[in-house]
Regions:
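Non-transmembrane, aqueous-exposed alpha-helical and coiled segments at domain scale
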Residues: 1-254
Length: 254
């Protein structure tokens, strides 16, 4: 038995079998969105899904220095002006607090469990009660810049509705938003782009990891653009000049 086995691809003389399709045919007849969808999920998207995933893949193209991925990548490029290490370092800055929709995805999984045979509103009320009572932050909600509404989430939700792809996960996360406002009175913690991507990914039948993969694909062009700019026009060896020391005063003797 071979050391590796895979259902993703097979390289043969003169071609590549990607999920049962000829890569040469994909190159000629498919878009990048369709090819990425096929590679990650094992199937080709239909026309409506392709259009929605086009929106997904442009939703995180750039968000400036608000994104820790950009700041990290530019610092790395400043100290080590090489493209690939800086891009890789930027991706490593993604996680539970930025970019990754994985935690929002699992919130929706948990809400489904709490809802059982109940309504979206009942599921939302139960999960909000749990998180608020335990003083836990709801993943997929809130943004440091977009206080009342994350326009990227709004655009994707509108597009999903227009295309007939606003499924149960979108409806559920919107119900969670309403329940949170009703419970706390806070209107400045909207559904953010991570929450929107998680809901859309679930409605498209993606796994949590597949949803994260599409988020990373979305952020890469902007991240790479910042790395290129930093290498070509930025300051060498950026550093933070100001920092408050909060330790003991310099008074000890050895």
């Amino acid at each position: 038995m071979s050391y590796f086995s895979t259902s993703v691809s097979e390289v043969i003389e003169g071609g590549v079998n990607l999920r049962g399709y000829s890569l040469a045919e994909i190159m000629k007849k498919a878009t990048y969105t369709q090819g990425a969808f096929l590679s990650l999920t094992g199937r080709l998207p239909d026309e409506a899904e392709t259009r929605l995933v086009d929106g997904v893949l442009t939703s995180l193209l750039d968000h400036g220095y608000v994104a820790s991925t950009i700041t990290a990548a530019r610092y790395i490029a400043s100290g080590n002006p090489q493209f690939i290490p800086a891009v890789a370092g930027g991706i490593l800055a993604a996680g539970s607090n930025t970019l990754s929709p994985e935690h929002s995805f699992h919130l929706l999984d948990h809400t489904d469990e709490l809802r059982g045979d109940g309504t979206f509103e009942e599921g939302a009320e139960r999960v909000v009660e749990e998180y608020v009572s335990q003083k836990k932050r709801l993943p997929g909600f809130g943004h440091p810049t977009h206080k009342t509404s994350d326009f990227r989430a709004d655009v994707l939700f509108d597009l999903a509705e227009e295309l007939g792809l606003d499924g149960s996960s979108i409806k559920q996360i919107q119900a969670i938003n309403r329940a949170f406002i009703a419970k706390t009175g806070k209107t400045n913690i909207p559904i953010n782009i991570d929450g929107a991507l998680a809901a859309i990914g679930r409605d498209l039948g993606w796994s949590a990891n597949q949803t994260v993969a599409f988020a990373v694909l979305s952020v890469l062009p902007g991240l790479m653009a910042h790395v290129i700019e930093e290498i070509e026009t930025g300051r060498p060896l950026r550093y933070i000049q100001d920092g408050d020391y909060v330790g003991e005063p310099l008074a000890k003797k050895l």
